[in-house]
Amino acid sequence: MEMNEITVDNETMAHIAIFEKIARIELMECVENEDMILFVVGEHKMAEMFRKNKEVISQLKEKINKHILVAEVSRDLLTFVRNIFFRYGVNEIQISWKNNRTDIVVGVKPEEIGKVIGKEGKNIKLFKDAVSRYFNVNSISVKQ
């Protein structure tokens, strides 16, 4: 997996330190906006994280004061996208490779669409940013 170069600010560095202290596993990626933070962990690390600390999500939310999402990375694009959107009741993922473009449409539970998109599209942008760090993706949208 090829990763793009990323600049990390002091706040993100602090969030990474908090995650690693509470979750007690190594973090691969941290992507955030004003309302949400997505922590990406290694393959098969979620079970280990919850074995070490069942209250990890609530403790992170208490310390960071943002909506917390944790997803396992995968070398497979479909699996990685499913992992990121899992919490929203993903029921369909369409990946289109045409004209040197990779476009993804994700279907989630109807009541979750607003949360996935976020205010002014901030959450869906965050998810695209996370996926784009590992895969060359042009767009991610939510099936309406």
UniProtKB/Swiss-Prot annotation:
The keyword Transcription applies. GO terms for cellular component: cytoplasm. GO terms for molecular function: RNA binding. One of its GO terms (biological process) is DNA-templated transcription termination. InterPro entries: KH_dom-like_a/b, KH_dom_NusA-like, KH_sf_prok-type, NusA_arc. Keywords: Cytoplasm, RNA-binding, Transcription, Transcription regulation, Transcription termination. NCBIfam families: nusA_arch, PRK08406.1-2. Belongs to the NusA family. This is Probable transcription termination protein NusA. It comes from Thermoplasma acidophilum (strain ATCC 25905 / DSM 1728 / JCM 9062 / NBRC 15155 / AMRC-C165).
